[in-house]
């Protein structure tokens, strides 16, 4: 009998030990459930607030029933403070949501859509995010790609045969206006014997090329007759593309490095290496001859006439005749080049300053809005805790306020001298 009882006790003891362990595991799992915790916390908040209100009412009733009027008021204030202090010191106050972290309201517009940050985007295509770029359509600020230059030439121009090998230096600051066409290019060729068959490659007929002797070797009446003849042939052959203006080749040294020539270039050519090497239009021919006839520029020495068409040569052979060919429009090209380049640089600086001003003002407005939101949140928190809230930041009068602790004041002092220091 004893053995049976002891055996029964041995068997039943593990069962009794397993049951509390399973119950404890279930309770822990149930207690660690986040939804369960949130429900318990909300319930505790409701019960605690209800108990506090009932306690306040009980204290108020007991004090109103006995005692004079002044003591009643003082006791009422003390009871309210005690109850509020008790309510605020309970650890479950952590369940009150943090408004500054939980609210994801966007109080300011997205600045990326309105303004582009610096440095400017130099990808192929167009300038992104520069609102002032369209105001200066007549200037090429060096960031536009080859497609932009082709579109500026207009639909009048047909695709040219040798346009596959044209050399462009778009990142160099090449300035031209809307009526200038990008006819500055050279067809690709392997050796010097290859010539382009079509005379329309650079928009320059052979009649002008044969007349490339310097004006000093021709009489005046031949010059006038030849100018009329050139104008007539050009009007009959190409009426549309040659109505454009002068083409400048501004950075010759970086695009085409000069070859060592057998003959030294003339003094008139040395001053115009960066301005204009040759002219491509009948208006330029007329200007050249008019300048020579009026005595604006005297050609010194004898020039070497080009026997082969200079513009149809490959890039290897086209450098030497360029230096040997005289350029009577050197002084005029220099003047126009000096007039255009500083003007465009000033325009680009103005556009960049305008964009920076817009960016700074929008950022300042954003800071004002965010400061207002922060102040409202802090004021609400202070009123909930029974404190008085006072701030030294007056965002409504930012222009007149000079509070050194304000972030807007520091922001303006740091950024605006950067813009207007010059």
Curated annotation (Swiss-Prot):
Keyword Protein biosynthesis carried by entry: no
Alphabetical GO biological process terms: chemical synaptic transmission, postsynaptic; inhibitory postsynaptic potential
Coiled-coil intervals: 344-370
Location(s), subcellular: Postsynaptic density
GO-annotated cellular components: GABA-ergic synapse; postsynaptic density; postsynaptic specialization
Keywords: Coiled coil, Phosphoprotein, Synapse
Chain segments carrying region Disordered: 143-163
InterPro entries, per database record: INSYN2 (IPR029337)
Pfam families xrefs: FAM196
Basic and acidic residues: compositionally biased ranges: 146-160
Primary localization: other
Modified positions (Phosphoserine) in chain numbering: 177
Record's subunit section: Interacts with GPHN.
Purpose of the protein: Component of the protein machinery at the inhibitory synapses, probably acting as a scaffold. Inhibitory synapses dampen neuronal activity through postsynaptic hyperpolarization. This synaptic inhibition is fundamental for the functioning of the central nervous system, shaping and orchestrating the flow of information through neuronal networks to generate a precise neural code.
Family: Belongs to the INSYN2 family.
Name this polypeptide is given: Inhibitory synaptic factor 2A
Organism: Mus musculus
Lineage per the UniProt record: Eukaryota, Metazoa, Chordata, Craniata, Vertebrata
Gene: Insyn2a
């Amino acid at each position: 009998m004893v053995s049976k009882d002891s055996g029964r006790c041995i068997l039943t003891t593990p069962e009794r030990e397993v049951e509390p362990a399973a119950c404890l595991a279930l309770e822990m799992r149930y207690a660690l459930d986040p939804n369960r915790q949130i429900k318990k916390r909300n319930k505790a908040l409701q019960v605690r607030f209800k108990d506090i209100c009932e306690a306040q009412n009980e204290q108020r009733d007991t004090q109103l029933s006995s005692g004079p009027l002044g003591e009643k008021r003082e006791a009422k204030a003390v009871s309210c403070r005690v109850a509020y202090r008790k309510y605020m010191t309970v650890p479950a106050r952590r369940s009150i949501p943090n408004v500054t972290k939980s609210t994801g309201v966007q109080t300011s517009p997205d600045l990326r859509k309105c303004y582009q940050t610096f440095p400017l985007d130099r990808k192929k295509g167009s300038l992104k995010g520069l609102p002032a770029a369209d105001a200066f359509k007549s200037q090429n600020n060096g960031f536009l790609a080859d497609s932009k230059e082709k579109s500026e030439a207009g639909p009048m121009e047909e695709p040219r045969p040798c346009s596959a090998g044209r050399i462009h230096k778009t990142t160099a600051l090449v300035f031209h206006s809307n009526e200038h066409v990008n006819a500055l290019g050279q067809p690709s060729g392997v050796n010097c014997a290859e010539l382009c068959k079509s005379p329309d490659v650079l928009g320059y007929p052979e009649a002008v090329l044969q007349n490339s002797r310097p004006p000093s070797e021709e009489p005046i009446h031949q010059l006038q007759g030849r100018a009329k003849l050139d104008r007539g042939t050009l009007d009959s052959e190409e009426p549309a593309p040659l109505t454009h203006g002068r083409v400048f080749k501004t950075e010759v040294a970086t695009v085409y490095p000069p070859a060592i020539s057998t003959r030294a270039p003339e003094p008139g050519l040395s001053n115009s290496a960066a301005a204009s090497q040759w002219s491509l239009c009948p208006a330029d021919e007329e200007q050249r001859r008019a300048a020579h006839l009026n005595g604006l520029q005297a050609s010194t020495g004898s020039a070497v006439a080009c026997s082969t068409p200079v513009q149809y040569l490959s890039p290897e052979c086209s450098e030497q005749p360029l230096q040997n060919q005289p350029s009577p429009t050197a002084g005029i090209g220099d003047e126009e080049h000096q007039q255009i380049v500083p003007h465009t640089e000033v325009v680009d600086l103005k556009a960049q300053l305008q964009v920076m001003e817009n960016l700074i003002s929008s950022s300042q407005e954003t800071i004002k809005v965010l400061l207002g939101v922060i102040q409202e949140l802090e004021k609400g928190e202070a009123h909930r805790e029974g404190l008085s809230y006072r701030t030294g930041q007056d965002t409504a009068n930012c222009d007149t306020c000079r509070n050194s602790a304000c972030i807007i004041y520091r922001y303006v002092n740091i950024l605006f001298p950067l813009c207007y220091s010059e």
